[in-house]
Amino acid sequence: MQNIINSWFVQGMIKATYDMWLKGWDERNGGNVSLRLLDDDVVSYKDEFYQNPRHVEITQNITALANQYFIVTGSGKFFRNVIIDPADTLAVIKVDEQGKGYYIMWGLVNGGVPTSELPAHLQSHIVRMKVSGGKDRVIMHCHATNLIALTYVLELDPKVITRELWEMSTECLVVFPDGVGVLPWMTPGKDEIGYATAQEMAQHPLVLWAFHGVFGTGPTLDDAFGLIDTAEKSAEILVKVLSMGGKRQTIQTDEFKLLAERFGVTPMDGVL
């Protein structure tokens, strides 16, 4: 008999959340992750689902996700504890047929609900499903230290921040050619920030929340983690460069164009 704890998606969430905590991106209960699951992913584990699952209503329209499964981190759960007790800190949910709420099918054994940022996750999933043709299945949010720091000193303009990050590491243009979206400070956990994040996610795989954190997406947990890790490394370099008095030389526009041609990527409009 298979055990859901040993499934690739629970084990993947354990590794991702622990890696994020080790990076220092997810202090206390900061950060959240969601992974869209296919029917084939869960079919072998349905006998472990709750017979009478709790239903939670939401205020958004998520009809585009009707009957879809997700594994998500729980509200108020510490990332450092997911590896210790995944059944308490994670949840498998299923969006209801009407798209007006979801059922908690597994997990959160000691009570609770999924992450308070679920509105931003679900709206972003809807958008990224369309943009990627269904390939993007992960939404990841964390408090990446250096990316947050930059929102205090750089103009909150996607083109400005994207260019600065591209200049700090050659691989950045290749890893996120669509650049970084940026939102001003907004109240977390509300529908408004969820819709605003999704709007940016329609154009960018990374979205910075000023003074708060970053959202990233990708087909897999590794892809989403690697995307944020790459941007955060570049932000760390920029923080150090700024602390040393600023740039004396950097990658030039014509060099970026050569880089884009070499790797077959199309840079975000207006950045070069």
Swiss-Prot record:
Q: Per the annotation, how and in what number is the cofactor bound? A: Binds 1 zinc ion per subunit.
Give the required cofactors. Answer: Zn(2+)
Matching InterPro entries, A to Z? Aldolase_class_II_sugar_metab, Aldolase_II/adducin_N, Aldolase_II/adducin_N_sf, Rhamnulose-1-P_Aldolase
Where does this protein chiefly localize? cytoplasm
Entry annotation: catalytic residues: E117
| Molecular-function GO term, any one | metal ion binding
What would be one Gene Ontology cellular-component term for the protein? cytosol
Residue numbers binding Zn(2+): H141, H143, H212
Domain of life of the organism in this record?
A: Bacteria
Under PANTHER family, the record lists: FUCULOSE PHOSPHATE ALDOLASE, RHAMNULOSE-1-PHOSPHATE ALDOLASE
Role description: Catalyzes the reversible cleavage of L-rhamnulose-1-phosphate to dihydroxyacetone phosphate (DHAP) and L-lactaldehyde.
Q: Which NCBIfam families match?
A: PRK03634.1, rhamnu_1P_ald
Protein's name in the database: Rhamnulose-1-phosphate aldolase
- What species is this protein from? Mannheimia succiniciproducens (strain KCTC 0769BP / MBEL55E)
Print the organism lineage: Bacteria, Pseudomonadati, Pseudomonadota, Gammaproteobacteria, Pasteurellales
Q: Which gene encodes it?
A: rhaD
